[in-house]
């Protein structure tokens, strides 16, 4: 499970940031990026890094008054600026002249933890990635914890924390392989416990995500782990497979299903497949795919019920158990409603007494019997049984609804 201090620290950071920045999120972002541009134009080293002016960068680095660790509005260094602008020559000059910047993270609340390598892999600049790694760029340790990259409602992106997950979301297979070869763990998890596969399931470009899933799973299989990567749960107990079902990502779900199937035989257009129902069937799994679909609020998740083998499994369960269970409940409910209706129809009434006070508009001819008059005859006792059944049935229905 996720550590409590980590969650408290995340919540406190968000609360502190919102108290310090009482403006709207979008307005605050606009102001921050305007300040970022202003800093670039005012700080000579930043400006030359943005303009890719190698000669000026070398002169500035040789100047004693130049602070190579100077930060901008985003907490960025000059190397971050060069990498964000995809300026290879400027970035190489900065790495050669100030190698201390290679693993320096951004320090602002928004971009906390972003290293130049994070930016290079997202921009898919393979040459920059190669230069950063060959000069000692750390691919395993850096973690992005800035609020801009947190998963939230209305968020623009969620790439996780680690460099590998950033590379996976970008979808460049050469960069993914390069990062893994440099020592990145395929099983690293972010503050939600999400691995790179979880994060890929949440990406909008499903085709690229599926290709990255295949590559990362293939590289992870080389390590001969006891548990396959696609069965590693996050801190909410969801594997990438279950997360795809919960989010209604049909493409990723079908892709992961197909990776688990076994072809029995093939004859022309006919193919017989065996499907692994682990994580799908609700038998012995309280958080199965079926449970997540039925209990979730995502409408698009219902579409997964049409995907093989979920459709066949639901049909089989309905024919074997569901329809009989439904018919039994329907019968019990009809009996309950019938009993309740009869109790209402034969409620204890008597003729209105002669001294019954009524207005000219009141046409009442029968009134409710007193309690002692209501339960005298055999018919009254039968009605009493029906009333007890009605009350108990109402409590049972209430308890069932509350439990669900």
How should these model regions be labeled?
Residues 30, 59-66, 92-103, 130-148, ...:
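Ankyrin repeat domain, specifically the short helix-to-loop turn at the C-terminus of the second helix
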Residues 38-44, 71-77, 105-115, 142-163, ...:
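Ankyrin-repeat boundary/"N-cap" motif
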Residues 47-52, 81-87, 119-125, 166-172, ...:
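Ankyrin repeat A-helix N-terminal signature
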Residues 55-56, 89-90, 127-128, 174-175, ...:
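Conserved ankyrin/ankyrin-like repeat signature
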